[in-house]
């Protein structure tokens, strides 16, 4: 089992405690660790080489969602949180050999978009949030 290459603090399950979201850049999986005992919860055990993650309220429901990219999987994805730490995967692209992702309101419309930097795909891609 490979260790995490990226970690980010966030209240994942809405209990007021800061948990840790983590990715395995040299292995498979995206997970979160629940405070205060740091119990591991697997979010996705199929995505490969997830070098970065970001979190924010992508779907506008008030909880923490996350985005990541799987370099070897060629995936750009975001995970919808139900507010209790259970996640549903949404695939944005199946052709992104990327290392970095960022959640930001790129167009200023009040909805969080996802930005992906593709190293081998040699691109920067903006995935606009479809909420209006």
Tell what function each PLM region has.
Residues 20-23, 66-69, 114-117:
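Hydrophobic beta-strand segments that make up the repeating blades of beta-propeller
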Residues 28-41, 75-88, 123-132:
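Beta-propeller blade repeat segments, especially FG-GAP/WD-type strand-to-loop junctions
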Residues 5-14, 51-58, 99-108:
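Beta-propeller blade termini
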Residues 52-55, 63-77:
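Loop/turn-rich, solvent-exposed surfaces of beta-rich toroidal or solenoidal domains
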Residues 24-28, 70-74, 119-121:
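Short, solvent-exposed loop/turn segments at conserved positions within beta-propeller repeat blades
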Residues 99-132:
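Blade-level signature of beta-propeller repeat domains, shared across WD40, Kelch, NHL, RCC1
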Residues 1-2, 43-48, 91-96:
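Surface loop/turn motifs at the tips and blade-to-blade linkers of beta-strand repeat domains
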